[in-house]
Amino acid sequence: MKNLWIWSLPLIVLAFIGWQELANQMPVATSRMTYGRLLEYMQMGWVKRIDVYDRTALIEASSPETGWQWIRVDLPANSSDWLEQAKTLHIDVDVHAVSNWINVASNWIIPLIIIGVVIWLLSRSASSNTTGALNFGKSKARFQMVAKTGIMFDDVAGIEEAKEELAEVVAFLKNPSKFLAVGASIPKGVLLVGPPGTGKTLLAKAIAGEASVPFFSISGSEFVEMFVGVGASRVRDLFKKAKQNAPCLVFIDEIDAVGRQRGAGIGGGNDEREQTLNQLLTEMDGFEGNTGVIVIAATNRVDVLDAALLRPGRFDRQIMVSMPDVKSRIAILKVHANQKKLHPQVSLEAVARRTAGFAGADLANLLNEAAILAVRRGLKQITWKEIDDAIDRVIAGMEGTPIMDGKIKRLIAYHETGHALTATLLPNHPPVQKVTLIPRRQAKGLTWFMQDNERDLLSKSQLMSMIMVALGGRAAEEAVFGNAEVTTGASNDLQQVTNLARQMVTRFGMSSLGPLCLETGNEEIFLGRDMRLMPEVSEEVIAQIDAQVRGMIEACYEKVLELMQANRVVMDRIVEELMEKETLDGKEFRQLVSQAARLTAVN
């Protein structure tokens, strides 16, 4: 800005002087007039005086219409008629010589201003580029001498095993002599692995809050740029700063952005990302070592990381941050419910059992959505109704416009009743939690099931029940409306059924083909894996797999169709109730089923 004033000040002074000079020499005209009109004014005797400045004339005239005024007239080149007429009419004519300095200044002021602005912009751009070039290879890591994340281990719930592992790292940083006395060495790195939303980044913040040592944080994507060598330079700069502040912590979030496996994927070769990874490997455990620097990284794609990055000496510990079970969900809900005003009748245990498959971030979002609904409804406390609606919203999306067409609504009611009734009549399927005709996202209706416990291992009978329940909607449509009226509403169900049946045959060995793993290669070659198109499976075996999958699905469908036809009365009664209320909870649904005179179940 200072240079701009230096360049602009002489030009402003020059322009002001020229303007003053012109203002002193030339009177100010109040209007303009054509040359022909000037001759008319002279014939009428209204012109008193003419001042000529080069090719411009200022006329002192007085007419009955406008009175006395100065009028500007542009004189044609080589015109002398006005001069002859002025002599004849004895009009005063005064010719003024315009200063050459004024002409020169007026011609050069604008070009000089433009040149000055261009020079200033170029100098500013050059300065900026020089600074940017010098800092381009510098690390973008955020540095805190004493981390102030506001999060401690007490604020992290539901992942106690991971907290215990990381508490040892914090204890080592606070009191290394205790460990060194027995010959224990400080771990080089800790890799936090787990699905999205399970609290990996939150754990890193808690470590920073507990350790009271210098803390660097950076995302893996911030290392890689389009320019060659920048990523490796940033890695060197990061570890240089870290070593200067040792002992310290370095947190790399989403390390898979820079740590993907090197190999024979498409494109392969020595690209910029591989150079960055090579530098990271060297800094973590190379010739010089990184004494006093502990690297904590987080990823949800440990399967794509390079093997050299995962070996002991770089990441000594891999801590699995898994999805929370019921007990962990209760602990997480208690942490997030501290700042929420819950109704006394709201049971966090009931919420935890209702939210199987929810990660910690999902549970936090759930309570926040419930709080927003409570405010929207004018309540001062969060009731079970708000939590129930929030769960539905998180799982299935916002409520859509209610279906007004009675025929379509009845068809959807039979479809959802088919799912729920099949699940109720099968002995080894989770009970119905809710059946609704309220549209959400792409679904016109929904059926939820209650997960009583976390099922990590599934039996063949349980998988068969899942297939039959998924086919229940289509079977109900056919049982009531006939095969010709079966709709596209079961497309997603059929996709799930086909995938599950194929896994039972090719992955779980639950078919007449025997206990064999016949999966095709699913390696993602773009992740640096080897290109493998198919395993060593013959075309005959592939045909047998297709036949097994088809036979399994057809057998299940026949059983479910028989079940729907045998329980048509029960189904009609449930549909009528569902059409009236639009939503039935699990208790209401089971009560309607229990009132039936005869139930036919399938073994």
Swiss-Prot record:
It is a multi-pass membrane protein. GO terms for cellular component: chloroplast thylakoid membrane. This is ATP-dependent zinc metalloprotease FtsH. Acts as a processive, ATP-dependent zinc metallopeptidase. It is an enzyme of class 3 (hydrolase). It is found in: Plastid, Chloroplast thylakoid membrane. One of its GO terms (biological process) is proteolysis. GO terms for molecular function: ATP binding; ATP hydrolysis activity; ATP-dependent peptidase activity; metalloendopeptidase activity; zinc ion binding. Gene3D superfamilies: 1.10.8.60, P-loop containing nucleotide triphosphate hydrolases, Peptidase M41. Keywords: ATP-binding, Chloroplast, Hydrolase, Membrane, Metal-binding, Metalloprotease, Nucleotide-binding, Plastid, Protease, Thylakoid, Transmembrane, Transmembrane helix, Zinc. It comes from the Eukaryota. Pfam families: AAA, AAA_lid_3, FtsH_ext, Peptidase_M41. ATP binds at G194, P195, P196, G197, T198, G199, K200, T201. It comes from Cyanidioschyzon merolae (strain NIES-3377 / 10D). In the central section; belongs to the AAA ATPase family. In the C-terminal section; belongs to the peptidase M41 family. InterPro entries: AAA+_ATPase, AAA_lid_3, ATPase_AAA_core, ATPase_AAA_CS, FtsH, P-loop_NTPase, Pept_M41_FtsH_extracell, Peptidase_M41. Binds 1 zinc ion per subunit. Its EC number is 3.4.24.-. Zn(2+) binds at H415, H419, D493. Residues 24-101 are lumenal.
